[in-house]
UniProtKB/Swiss-Prot annotation:
Plays a critical role in cytoplasmic virus egress. Participates in the final step of tegumentation and envelope acquisition within the host cytoplasm by directly interacting with the capsid. Upon virion binding to target cell, a signaling cascade is triggered to disrupt the interaction with the capsid, thereby preparing capsid uncoating. Its main location: virion. It is found in: Virion tegument; Host cytoplasm; Host nucleus. Pfam families: Herpes_UL16. It comes from Elephantid herpesvirus 1 (isolate Asian elephant/Berlin/Kiba/1998) (EIHV-1). This is Cytoplasmic envelopment protein 2. Belongs to the herpesviridae cytoplasmic envelopment protein 2 family. GO terms for cellular component: host cell cytoplasm; host cell nucleus; viral tegument.
Length: 336
């Protein structure tokens, strides 16, 4: 039960705790400053939220060390001062290190229930200096994955949420969520894929049987993502790392060069989704449990299981991918 006396403070606190990953942008003897960029929240977090649609939040926070046993939290949204609030405790946790950019550190901040300030101090000067764009190469995602060689059962792993129809799931155990997906074997990915793109089966299918129109929000993803590792900037597409794309249309091959990845049968003209397995609470480790090929005369063709492996992505990277996408947020995150 929240002890916040203002009705909007608790939704805001939950948003900061669950949907924001921060970079430290400044520090002094008595303060720390952090910045984050998060996609649109599934829940209203600001009093004006119902009045207009907000697709991303760029937030600056200055945490001033204790005054009368409370921290003072100064907050700016989109570069404009929003308000100051009190918080009895703030936990700072090193969450992720992006080694490809000099070991840049990302933090998770956990705030105890907020309290309103009766009188604000002077508005601070927030650091809104643009920071360089950061990203992770798609092939580097493999460094944060483990291969799954046997079925994952909800009774053991926790709840399972299917994401789209292309072999992607969110597996939640307690407060931890892992993205589980089929992806190309690493040796194949190194040889044939764009190194910027993580070659999940969802991405490969979108390339193979999708419409190839850059404006298609199904095949190339919607344009409301924020960048996974940026803490400033605008929203746009993220077909390199996100898992929200799924092919539109009839799933017949439009890129014939992709066909050998899915089957050795030259007569295959498309991919189809099987009827759901008997156990929806189990993720099977073979792609052929979910998909099959089809020939021009309607005959079923087995897919080549050896080219795709089932991977479990590290929960911290999974979380960063989820909070960068409003669709994944709605599917994978539970309102507290």
């Amino acid at each position: 039960m929240s002890t916040s006396s203002e009705p909007y403070l608790e939704p805001l606190r939950l948003f900061l705790n669950k949907e924001c990953i921060w970079r430290k942008t400044g520090k002094g003897a008595k303060h720390r400053e952090y910045r984050c960029l998060s996609s649109s929240s599934p829940w209203s977090i600001l009093p004006h939220q119902a009045a207009r649609r907000v697709w991303k939040y760029e937030i600056n926070i200055i945490i001033v060390k204790k005054r009368n046993d409370d921290y003072i939290i100064s907050m700016a949204i989109e570069g404009l001062h929003y308000q100051q609030i009190l918080c009895p405790k703030v936990l700072t946790q090193l969450f992720f290190i992006l080694h490809s950019h000099g070991g840049t550190k990302f933090y998770k901040l956990t705030f105890d229930p907020f309290k309103p300030m009766n009188a604000e101090l002077a508005v601070p000067l927030y650091d809104t200096t643009p920071l360089p764009h950061m990203t992770m190469q798609g092939l580097s995602v493999y460094d944060h994955c483990s291969v799954v060689g046997k079925p994952i059962c909800a009774q053991v792993a926790g709840s399972i949420t299917q994401i789209g129809t292309c072999g992607v799931w969110a597996v939640t155990t307690g407060a931890q969520t892992n993205i589980v997906c089929f992806a190309l074997r690493y040796d194949l990915a190194v040889c044939i894929s764009d190194p910027k793109v993580f070659p999940s089966m969802a991405r490969c299918m979108a390339s193979a049987v999708g419409c190839a129109q850059e404006t298609c929000s199904y095949c190339t993803g919607h344009n409301k993502h924020v960048e996974v590792f940026d803490v400033n900037g605008d929203y746009g597409k993220n077909k390199e790392l996100c898992f929200c794309s799924t092919p539109c249309g009839d799933w017949d091959f439009r890129d014939e060069s992709m066909k050998p990845l899915f089957s050795k049968n030259d007569d295959m003209v498309g991919i189809r989704v099987r009827e759901p397995p008997n156990s929806e609470n189990t993720i099977f480790s073979k792609a052929s449990a979910y998909f099959y090929g089809i020939t021009r005369d309607g005959k079923e063709v087995d897919l080549s299981d050896e080219n795709f492996i089932l991977l479990k992505i590290d929960p911290r990277l999974s979380h960063m991918i989820i909070v960068a996408c409003p669709i994944l947020k709605r599917m994978c995150m539970i309102k507290s």
